[in-house]
């Protein structure tokens, strides 16, 4: 039986084993998929031991995505630009690194009809979560504005993708003069209740709001935008299932159906 895993710290909350087992049932593929608590001080050795002992592939979550990027022998173009890897594939004694976060996000945005050609997108945050989704958004023709508490970080990130499409960095206090079709929160600090200093005026009924993170009930970001009048909003659970589907496809050569798994998981408690 092929062995797969997800590496993280913490990891007990991960939905990935459940998702991949449902994909396996759907496609008739026999596999083992486990959540593995990786040590903070020696992730590369831990990961390589898994592959040398027969592991075929692994998902990588916080805080190891940058280390996974560094240890990959081969990177896909989207992973190279993202500077982070969330999917590892052991092939012919070489480690391939990919990043399916961005394509997972775009897939979910299409499912929700939140994105279109030339959508004006405000992306909140300039860390790894934001960086991993910029290229797929630009490839959709989106025009991206980056906002971050440390404006210099947003400027540096925008500069890194300048050749790939329309992207700029805007300070929070300048956002009030702009209108957006979609606002995406890519700041994990929101889960602790820390909200970005957004001007209320940019939250309009026709502006969709998406939080890349999820938890049981509304995230603080989604609760806040709803209070400001937003009516089209979604959390990142659909993105999680979609990025997992693309990782599954990389490993097994077959794209599973996302919708049935998402429906089933939505009926189960979210950790």
UniProtKB/Swiss-Prot annotation:
The active site is at 65 (proton acceptor). Its EC number is 1.1.1.25. Shikimate binds at residues 14-16, 61, 86, 101, 214. The keyword Amino-acid biosynthesis applies. GO terms for molecular function: NADP binding; shikimate 3-dehydrogenase (NADP+) activity. The keyword Oxidoreductase applies. Pfam families: SDH_C, Shikimate_DH, Shikimate_dh_N. GO terms for cellular component: cytosol. It catalyses: shikimate + NADP(+) = 3-dehydroshikimate + NADPH + H(+). NADP(+) binds at residues 125-129, 148-153, 212, 236. Keywords: Amino-acid biosynthesis, Aromatic amino acid biosynthesis, NADP, Oxidoreductase. GO terms for biological process: amino acid biosynthetic process; aromatic amino acid family biosynthetic process; chorismate biosynthetic process; shikimate metabolic process. Pathway: Metabolic intermediate biosynthesis; chorismate biosynthesis; chorismate from D-erythrose 4-phosphate and phosphoenolpyruvate: step 4/7. Belongs to the shikimate dehydrogenase family. Homodimer. HAMAP family: Shikimate_DH_AroE (MF_00222). Involved in the biosynthesis of the chorismate, which leads to the biosynthesis of aromatic amino acids. Catalyzes the reversible NADPH linked reduction of 3-dehydroshikimate (DHSA) to yield shikimate (SA). This is Shikimate dehydrogenase (NADP(+)). It comes from Edwardsiella ictaluri (strain 93-146). The gene is aroE.
């Amino acid at each position: 039986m092929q062995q797969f895993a997800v590496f993280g710290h913490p990891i007990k909350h991960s939905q990935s084993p459940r998702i991949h087992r449902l994909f396996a049932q759907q496609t008739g593929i026999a596999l083992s998929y486990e959540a593995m608590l990786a040590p903070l001080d020696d992730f590369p050795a831990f990961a390589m031991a898994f592959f040398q002992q027969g592991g075929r592939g692994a998902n990588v979550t916080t805080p190891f995505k940058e280390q996974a990027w560094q240890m990959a022998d081969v990177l896909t173009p989207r992973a190279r630009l993202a500077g982070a890897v969330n999917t590892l594939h052991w092939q012919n004694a070489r480690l391939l690194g990919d990043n399916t976060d961005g394509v997972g996000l775009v897939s979910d945005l299409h499912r929700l009809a939140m994105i279109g050609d030339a959508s004006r997108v405000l992306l909140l945050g300039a860390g790894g979560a934001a960086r991993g989704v910029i290229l797929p958004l630009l490839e959709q023709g989106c025009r991206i504005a980056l906002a971050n508490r440390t404006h210099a970080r947003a400027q540096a990130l925008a500069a890194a993708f300048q050749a790939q499409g329309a992207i700029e960095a805007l300070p929070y206090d300048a956002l009030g003069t702009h209108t957006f079709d979609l606002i995406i929160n890519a700041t994990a600090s929101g889960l602790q209740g820390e909200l970005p200093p957004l001007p209320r005026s940019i939250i309009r009924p026709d502006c969709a709001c998406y939080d890349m993170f999820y938890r049981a009930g509304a995230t603080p970001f989604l609760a806040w935008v709803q209070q400001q009048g937003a009516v089209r909003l979604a959390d990142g659970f659909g993105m999680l299932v979609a990025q997992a589907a693309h990782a599954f496809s990389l490993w097994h050569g077959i794209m599973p159906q996302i919708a049935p798994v998402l429906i089933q998981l939505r009926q189960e408690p979210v950790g």
